[in-house]
Structures are given as C-alpha cells and as structure tokens.
C-alpha cells in the first residue's frame, strides 16, 4: 500500500485513540463520582466537557481485545460509523475502509497494538499534546513519502512558524481559505499558548477544496481540541466561498502554486478583483486578491507564493502587482531558501500585506509605527541547513532572525537597521524605479566582506608567493608522472617483442 492510502489508515487510528483516551479519562472521573449520582454512560456528561461521545462498540479496548481477529477491519469501520452517528460534527469525516481486502489485517492489528502502548499521560491536555505531535509527525512523513501530492495537505513546519511568528495572531479572527490539514491553525493556537495568551481570544475560519484533505483538517484540529469553522463540507474557495462576509484580522495561507485550471473564465466580473482581473491561466493573483478582499480594516495577511509572482508581467499580472503596491498594501517580502517543500523545488517567497499601515497593533497589543510608503525586503535564501539530500529545514534561530527583523522594523520590539545582503527598507519610489518588481535580491545588495586587517600589498605578495610554490609543485608532480608513464611504456613494449 502506498503512502497516500496508508496515511488514512494510520491517521484514522490516531484520531480514534485520542478521542478514546479523552473519553476513558472522563469515564473514570464519573465512575469515581457515582455515589454523587454521576453516570459514566450519560452522553451529556461528555458533550458538556467538549468531548466526543464514544459508543461501546467504538471504544479502544474493544479494538485492542480483537486486534488479531480476522474481523478487525470490519470492527474498526463499525467504530468509525458509530462515532459519526453519535457525533454530528464528525459526520462524513472519518475513514471507513479498514475492511477492504487489500488492507493487511495482520499489520492493522500490529498498528492497534503499537498505538495501545502509546503513553499519553494522565491528563487530557498532556494526552492531547502527545497525540497531536504524533499526528503532526505522521502528516510530515506522509507528505515526504508522497512528494508532490503531499504538498496538497502539508506545509513544512518551519514555513508555518515563520508566517505565524511574523503576524503574531493574539486576538481576533484567523482565516485560511486553502487550509490543507490545518497546520496554520495549529501553530496559531500554539503561538497564543506560548505567549501566555488566551485560546478563546482567537476564532478560526477555514476552507479546503479537496474532500480528503478537508477530513484530515477536521481530525487534526479535533485531536488538539481546536474549535474551527471549516464549513459543513469541502468547497472551492473561488467558486463557492463558504465565508463570504468574513473580514479577518489575520490571514495565513499556502495556496497551490501557479494553478491554471481554477475556472477563472467564469469569474471575469467577480467583486474580489479590485486590482485587476487575474489571468485564467494562473491563479496566483486571484489568491492574493481573495486575501485582500477578506481582510478587516486593520487586518494583516501572510502567505506563500512562487517567486515568479514577484516579477512576472505575463497576462496582466505585473499590472495587478503594481496596483497592489501603489495601494500601499505590501508590508514585507521574504525570499525563502530552496528545498523547504516536499511538493516542489520551485523557489518561494512570503508576502505580508497590511490593510492599514499607518498604525495598527502588534505583539501583546503594542502600537506599530507608520510604515506608509515603505516596504521591508528580507533575503533569507542563505539560511537553514539540509536535513537530507533534498529537504532543508530552518532552526529556531533562523526563524527568529526573520521574525525579529520584521517586528523591529514595524516598531514592535528591538531596533531595526538595514543589513547588506539580508534586509533593506525600500521606499515606493525605489520600487517604482525597479518597475514594481518585488524580488528582495534587487534591494538588499550583497553582504559586506569582513576586513581581516591585512594590508593589500602584503596580502598580494603572500598570495603570489603561495601561487608560485603551487605552480612549482605542480610542475614537479607532472614530471614524476611523465617519467613513470615512460617507464611503463618501455616495459610494455619489451613484453610485446618477447
């Protein structure tokens, strides 16, 4: 079975294990309170705590006790069906293909054994964190195994962390119109927790067109106890916007790159195209304008686009980019290093737009400086390290370097200064002079060479002497090699005449 199929088997079981553990924990509490009238089989006791009700045939112990029976696939499918029937929010979300003949039932039983031994601790929050990390690990591994197709549901963690760290979503509405498996939302809630904020201060809205990926997102968020409005079903964001009236405080997104079959010919008069009608052959600037359309008056957006969007003039895209720049919406552009994504080797950049750049609020509600008429360019192509031959990752220090530069620049902590080769504040006049091209490399210049203090004349003499010695050594070695070749030739000729 390939990774694309296997992931649903594994992730479905992880989800079932999580909700069963949370259920069992509450069940034990109610049993202990039985003398006070508590009933562990009362569904309302679980719903009131924000937990899923797990009917008897769907409980993990039932599956564990029958893990090596030939009917285990049917039992797991039945458990999933029972969960959906008893919990309306899970309807049509869970995988139900465990009984199919192509699934090795012995391996399925071994998986159940392995997850049964997973130690998640005694507290619900601790269990959620451990299983959430396991779920995230498998998402990343399956994305890597699937390659290009894996990119449809997974954005690398380092990219998500940079986006979230830049926008710092403390309070308000967070929106991702192409949410994949929900990674932006998970990191947003994690950010709030790490900075001692209140989870209830952000509300989450999302949309996903792929039905399978939409289900992954629902399970991923449920495992972590994250409430989100992803709509009642999957839907195409361009043609069936599930949140038409939403004006978000934060938009985080990794839209599919350069898609040509987005149905743009049917949307030529759409109200979202304030800055120009996007070409039917590429949806990049349709996504950008969709984000802008859904921003609140003080909203900010951070998203990933292929580097071509920074400079293209094809099919009117240059004019759209120019109009967005002249509307003073572009706050920051970050060129990212290559090989971050499992799905593509296309170089990417992060765009940050702000609806109101005259003021606004940053981390912990601090007021921001007026950035009107300026754009921050960051060239981060040289940071990060290779995790393996094909994938690069960013360290915490790498990510902090990018996010810290942005926060300092917008007046949100620390002192900002241009760093040749890495970051530069450019005026709109400078951007106009470059033809409204937003490629950071055009603005940041090159890193300053460190002066080692050695006078030029002395360095020139030293290097010339070294080069002369290397030439002499090269000539000596060449002479020895030619001498050996001559001897070899003489010996060979002598043998031929014998």
Regions found by a protein language model. Give the residues of each.
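Active-site lining segments that contact anionic ligands and/or coordinate catalytic metals
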Residues: 247-248, 272, 282-284, 298-306, ...
């Amino acid at each position: 079975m390939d990774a694309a199929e296997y992931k649903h088997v594994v992730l479905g079981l992880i989800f079932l294990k999580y909700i069963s553990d949370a259920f069992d924990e509450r069940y034990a509490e109610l049993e202990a309170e039985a003398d006070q009238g508590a009933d562990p089989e009362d569904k309302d006791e679980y719903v009131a705590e924000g937990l899923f009700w797990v009917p008897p045939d769907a409980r993990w112990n039932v599956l564990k006790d029958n893990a090596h029976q030939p009917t285990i696939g049917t039992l797991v499918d039945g458990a999933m069906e029972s969960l959906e029937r008893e919990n309306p929010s899970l309807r049509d979300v869970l995988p139900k293909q465990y009984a199919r003949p192509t699934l090795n039932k012995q391996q399925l039983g071994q998986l159940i054994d392995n997850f049964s031994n997973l130690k998640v601790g005694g507290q619900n929050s601790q269990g959620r964190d451990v299983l959430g990390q396991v779920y995230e690990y498998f998402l990343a591994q399956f994305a890597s195994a699937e390659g290009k197709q894996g990119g449809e549901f997974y954005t690398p963690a380092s990219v998500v962390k940079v986006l979230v760290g830049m926008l710092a979503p403390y309070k308000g509405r967070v929106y991702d119109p192409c949410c994949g498996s929900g990674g932006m939302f998970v990191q947003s809630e994690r950010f709030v927790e790490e900075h001692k904020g209140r989870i209830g201060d952000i509300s989450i809205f999302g949309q996903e067109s792929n039905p399978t990926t939409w289900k992954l997102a629902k399970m991923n968020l449920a495992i972590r106890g994250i409430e989100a409005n992803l709509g009642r079903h999957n839907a195409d964001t361009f043609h069936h916007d599930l949140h038409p009236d939403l004006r978000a405080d934060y938009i985080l997104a990794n839209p599919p790159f350069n898609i040509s079959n987005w149905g743009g010919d049917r949307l030529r008069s759409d109200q979202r195209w304030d800055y120009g009608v996007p070409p039917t052959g590429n949806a990049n600037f349709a996504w950008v304008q969709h984000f802008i359309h859904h921003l609140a008056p003080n909203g900010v957006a951070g998203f990933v686009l292929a580097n071509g969007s920074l400079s293209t003039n094809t099919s009117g895209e240059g004019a759209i980019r120019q109009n967005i720049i002249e509307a003073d919406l572009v706050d920051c552009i970050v060129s990212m290093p290559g090989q971050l994504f499992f799905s593509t080797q296309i170089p990417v950049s992060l765009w940050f737009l702000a609806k109101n750049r005259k003021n606004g609020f940053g981390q912990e509600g601090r007021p921001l400086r007026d950035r009107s008429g300026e754009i921050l360019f960051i060239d981060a192509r040289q940071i990060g390290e290779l995790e393996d031959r094909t994938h690069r990752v960013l360290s915490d220090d790498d990510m902090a370097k990018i996010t810290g530069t942005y926060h300092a620049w917008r007046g949100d902590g620390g002192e900002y200064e241009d760093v040749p080769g890495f970051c530069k504040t450019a005026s709109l006049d400078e951007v106009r002079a470059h033809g409204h091209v937003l490629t950071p490399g055009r603005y940041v210049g090159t890193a300053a060479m460190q002066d080692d203090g050695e006078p030029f004349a002395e360095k020139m003499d030293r290097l010339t002497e070294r080069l002369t010695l290397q030439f002499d050594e090269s000539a000596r070695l060449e002479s020895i090699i030619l001498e050996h070749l001559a001897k070899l030739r003489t010996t060979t000729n002598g043998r031929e005449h014998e």
